[in-house]
Each structure stands twice: as C-alpha cells, then as structure tokens.
C-alpha cells in the first residue's frame, strides 16, 4: 500500500476515445506509483494503416489483432501479479470499435458474431483480471480533434471528421452504461501530466474509488 491507498497489485485501466491522452496519462500515473505499464502497440500494428484506407476490408482483421494483443497483455498482468497501469481496455474493443463497424456495415454480421464469441470466451478465462478502477478521460470534441491534429498521425488526420464525431458519441453512451468495474471520470482540460501535484490529486481519487470496492 502507498500514500494513495492503492494496493501494490492493483490494475488501473485508462480509457477514452482516440487522441484523448490515454498513453500519456498511463505513463505518468505508472511513474508516480512505480507500476508497470501495459501500452497499446500502435506503431507495430500490421493492419492499422490499411484499416484507415479501407474500413470494410480490414475492420475484422484489425479488431482480431487488437483482441489477441490485449489478451496477451491481460495474461501478462495476471502472471505478474498486478501493479499495472493499462492503456485502453479490452471492453472498448468490443463495446465501441467492433460494434460501431458492425452497426455501420463495415464489419459483416458473421465476422462480428465470430469476434464477440471469441471476446466472451476470453473474458471467462482465469487469465482475465478485471480492472480495480477504470479512469475515463473525457473532454470537448474540439479539444480531442485538436489533439489528434497535433499528434500528427497521417492516417488519423486524413480520416473524415464524421468518423471521430460518431466515435465520440458512442464513447459518451458507452461509459454511461459501463459497469464491469468502478469508474473515475477525468476532464482532459482539468489536469496536467507534467505537474506532480496534479497527478497526486488524481491518484488520491483513484485510491478513494478502489477503497470503496
């Protein structure tokens, strides 16, 4: 246990839409706690760039890849005994991304059924530790779009604004119904990852949420 009342074996998951600052906050929180990080491997994803050029052709491949990578990370967290801050949850894969593409017809129904069946089988295994708290990052759509622009990933910048708008709406609906673990909601304009006092304040709140479990 530390000064924030966060157990040494805790799993803290950071969630939120693309560009909201999950990876940056994940690293900052892990550093303050002396925890390990579980980061999304975007740079070495063999499908991501192809997906942004052709959603219908590559949506299933991309989501299966993410699911496999996420499950390997979950198993690693389990075998390591916890003490992790995780960048993006496996729940977002199925609750946001796969469902969005199934709903808009860029993932066919058979593929979506296969995907959800595999997801459900994975979360039933003992290798699947549920987060002690999900830290949900939210903010205005203009702020998030500005961050996507500043990040400078060409495949994201070239994606139509309507795609990000739809994802933003789906995230807002998803988090209001999410109940797999306790949730702490943070506005991205109300903290500074470079300010130790700001990070301490967040971790105090994380500790309070975990203590109420």
Model-assigned labels for residue ranges:
Residues 22:
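Conserved lysine of the Walker
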Residues 1-10:
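Extreme N-terminal, non-catalytic leader segments
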């Amino acid at each position: 246990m530390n000064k924030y009342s966060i157990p040494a074996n805790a799993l803290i998951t950071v969630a939120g839409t693309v560009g909201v600052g999950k990876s940056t906050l994940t690293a900052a929180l892990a550093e303050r706690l002396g925890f390990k990080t579980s980061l999304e491997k975007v740079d070495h994803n063999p499908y991501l760039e192809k997906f942004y050029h052709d959603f219908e052709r590559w949506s299933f491949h991309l989501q299966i890849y993410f699911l496999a990578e996420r499950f390997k990370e979950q198993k690693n967290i389990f075998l390591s005994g916890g003490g992790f801050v995780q960048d993006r949850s496996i729940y977002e894969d199925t609750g946001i991304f796969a469902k969005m593409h199934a709903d808009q017809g860029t993932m066919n129904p058979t593929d979506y059924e296969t995907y959800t069946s595999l997801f459900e089988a994975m979360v039933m295994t003992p290798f699947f530790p549920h987060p002690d708290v999900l830290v949900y990052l939210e903010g205005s759509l203009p702020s998030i779009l500005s961050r996507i622009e500043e990040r400078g990933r060409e495949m994201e910048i070239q994606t139509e604004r309507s795609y990000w708008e739809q994802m933003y709406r789906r995230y807002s609906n998803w988090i209001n119904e999410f109940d797999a673990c306790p949730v702490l909601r943070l506005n991205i304009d109300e903290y500074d990852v470079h300010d130790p006092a700001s990070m301490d304040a967040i971790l105090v709140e994380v500790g309070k949420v975990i203590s109420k479990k």
